[in-house]
């Protein structure tokens, strides 16, 4: 990375966007303009030399100009897009950062070849194969999950309740990347929040569980990759005086899941191809 603004300001802008619920495309539209190499500028610096780019996609739909902020791909976003995002989320920018948003990125690059070697589709396929090996019939709900984390959890809980009469063991999978609009001061991540939201909806259901995790082994500013809950999670937390909806309001899923043994720890995986959430119904 070669930021055009002080590292502290870049981190502050990124944290502000995260806290406001900005999605990865919006974040990268801003970040590529604050970098000397992102937004196609790396390939521009290399010209006329040829650049061969091998890409792991962590963005739904594999937009090459947005993955890792597109250092070796023409940028489809504009200065007007960046200004709109900055205004929408009320970003506080220094004069230097504001000037960066007005510098257009390369729109044409003829010295680049690109190969995508992995994405959320491969993640979902691998997860489906693992579920099948464990005796579950996999059902892919979507590989483009893109909504509020707690809404995704509530949706998986609704799917669970709708399939309680099944005679087969089922695994419903959803790949993608949810967002969290922070309303509290707790600790957690989007996968932990998704799982805890699902716990409220599957409460009391036997042989039913939900887990959600980030493929990079990190979920939010925590040491966990995600969370795991089952039909008894809500009751176990209630016995400790923990109310799920109060926890979600404070965005404190980490501590709630820690209290009931529901945190998933994988360590750094060395890759990043979005997240996967899985609903398991065992028969």
Language-model segments: what does each one mean?
Residues 1-10, 184-191:
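Short Gly/Thr/Asp-enriched flexible loops that form oxyanion-binding sites at enzyme active sites
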Residues 3-95, 101:
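Internal gly/pro-rich beta-alpha loop/helix module
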Residues 4-24, 137-139, 201, 235-238, ...:
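Alpha/propeptide regions of enzymes that mature by internal proteolysis
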Residues 35, 43-49, 58-59, 65-67, ...:
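Solvent-exposed alpha-helices and their adjacent loops that cap or buttress functional pockets
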Residues 49-52, 74-155, 164:
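Accessory alpha-helical/coil subdomains and C-terminal extensions
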């Amino acid at each position: 990375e070669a930021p055009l603004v002080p590292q502290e300001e870049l981190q502050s802008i990124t944290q502000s966007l995260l806290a406001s619920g900005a999605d990865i495309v919006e974040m990268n539209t801003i970040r590529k303009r604050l970098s000397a190499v992102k937004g196609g500028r790396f390939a521009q610096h290399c010209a006329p030399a040829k650049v061969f780019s091998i890409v792991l996609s962590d963005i739904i739909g594999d937009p090459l100009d947005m993955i890792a902020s597109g250092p070796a791909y023409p940028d489809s976003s504009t200065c007007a897009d960046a200004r709109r995002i900055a205004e929408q989320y009320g970003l506080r920018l220094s004069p230097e950062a504001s000037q960066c948003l007005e510098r257009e990125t390369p729109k044409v690059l003829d010295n680049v070849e690109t190969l995508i070697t992995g994405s959320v589709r491969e993640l979902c396929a691998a997860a489906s194969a693992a579920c099948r090996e464990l005796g579950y019939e996999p059902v892919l709900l979507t590989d483009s999950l893109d909504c509020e984390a707690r809404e995704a959890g509530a949706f998986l809980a609704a799917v669970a309740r709708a399939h309680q009469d099944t005679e087969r063991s089922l695994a419903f999978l959803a790949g993608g990347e949810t967002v969290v609009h922070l309303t509290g001061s707790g600790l957690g991540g989007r996968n932990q929040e998704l799982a805890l939201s699902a716990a409220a909806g599957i409460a009391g259901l036997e042989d039913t569980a939900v887990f959600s995790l980030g493929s990079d082994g990190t979920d939010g500013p925590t040491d966990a990759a995600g969370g795991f809950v089952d039909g008894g999670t809500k009751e176990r937390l209630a016995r400790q005086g923990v109310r799920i909806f109060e926890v979600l309001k404070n965005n404190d899923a980490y501590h709630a899941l820690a209290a009931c043994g529901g945190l998933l720890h994988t360590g750094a995986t060395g890759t990043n191809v979005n997240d996967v959430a899985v609903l398991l119904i065992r028969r």
